[in-house]
A protein has these predicted regions:
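ATP/NTP phosphate-donor binding region
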Residues: 1-84
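Solvent-exposed alpha-helices and their adjacent loops that cap or buttress functional pockets
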Residues: 1-3, 24, 79-81, 102, ...
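Short glycine/serine/threonine-rich phosphate/pyrophosphate-binding segments
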Residues: 16, 39-43, 93-99, 119-122, ...
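Structural motif
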Residues: 29-31, 84-87, 108-110, 146-148, ...
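Active-site segments that bind and position negatively charged phosphate/pyrophosphate groups
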Residues: 188-294, 298
Length: 300
């Protein structure tokens, strides 16, 4: 038997107002797990939204990277063990650490992305690293988060470089999944995942530049929401339908090897992935698509 859980999400400047109605079905106590900056950005808004309805037992730093060691350390914190549910707040590495910790504890997980940098908040896969920050591997939970709350105001005030890198990372899904699935006899669910992957790039290419300008100004505009959905939800809709060997390809392989290879500069995940995507498209002879991605990358 196999179950597929599509992402459930709420998006908007008032997205956190929906927390009590959705989360009270799973208990009355919660903890927040995330990074220092992400908790500073989102925690006051979360506390206000749940005041008098859900008791917050504590707020905890996830660690310094998505490692099994950090996830296991979280499982030993008494307040986390006691809480009915966990609120994972932040970017991909904080979220993936909380995802694995809640998998070990068998607790309901709700995610609150404060960056539009990847699809981690809506997927079941956890991308894990060694304590030295080199890539270790990926591992799957039995399901993704129960619900994801995407506050567009919070993301509008997030660091520009993460949103910029998120645009680059999301574009890879459009091409990596069909590339990996080429020639395979796919199940209905896998075929759905491949089709979902091919819905990512249009939103990025149409709204990405204007959305990045909104983040530069710290404002919510009509372009911001569809761009956020194209970074967080659209790739996630593909990921939940396909296995690990279809979920990525050469673009992400180049990033993963980058973490283990001496290199100059400090390049964000999405930036390296987008470079890897252009290498993959060149290798595959998709020159027109490569040039389209290159022009977009240069424009931002």
């Amino acid at each position: 038997m196999k179950s597929t859980f599509f992402p459930h999400f709420t998006i908007g400047v008032d997205a956190y107002d929906a927390i009590p109605d959705i989360c009270l079905d799973y208990g009355k106590t919660a903890v927040i797990v995330g990074g220092e900056k992400s908790r500073a950005a989102a925690e006051p808004l979360i506390r206000k939204a749940i005041e008098g309805k859900i008791e917050l037992l504590g707020s905890f730093q996830y660690g310094d990277d998505a490692t099994f060691e950090n996830a296991e350390a979280l499982t030993r914190i008494p307040e986390i063990r006691k809480a009915d549910m966990v609120f994972a707040v932040g970017g991909g590495r904080a979220t993936d650490t909380a995802k694995w910790a809640t998998h070990l504890l068998k607790k309901p997980l709700f995610t609150f992305p404060t960056l539009a940098s990847n699809c981690a908040s809506v997927t079941a896969v956890c991308i894990m690293y060694h304590p030295d920050h080199s890539f270790k591997g990926s591992i799957y939970r039995d399901r993704n988060a129960y619900h994801t709350f995407i506050n567009t105001e919070v993301i509008a005030h997030s660091p520009r470089e993460y949103f910029w890198a998120g645009l680059g990372d999301a574009l890879a899904k459009q091409y990596e999944v069909p590339f990996s699935a080429r020639g395979m006899d796919l199940t209905w669910v896998q075929e759905t995942g491949v089709r979902n992957a091919q819905n990512v790039a249009p939103g990025i290419l149409k709204y990405g530049k204007a959305a990045l300008e909104a983040v530069d100004k710290g404002i919510v505009t009509d372009a911001l929401e569809p761009a956020i959905l194209s970074i967080i939800v659209a790739p996630g809709m593909a990921s939940v339908c396909i296995e690990d060997d279809l979920d990525s390809s050469l673009a992400h392989a180049i990033y993963n090897s980058h973490t283990r290879t001496p290199h100059k500069g400090n390049h964000l995940h999405g930036a390296v992935v987008n470079y890897g995507l252009q290498v993959m498209l060149t290798m595959d002879g998709q020159i027109e698509e490569r040039d389209k991605i290159y022009r977009f990358a240069k424009s931002i």
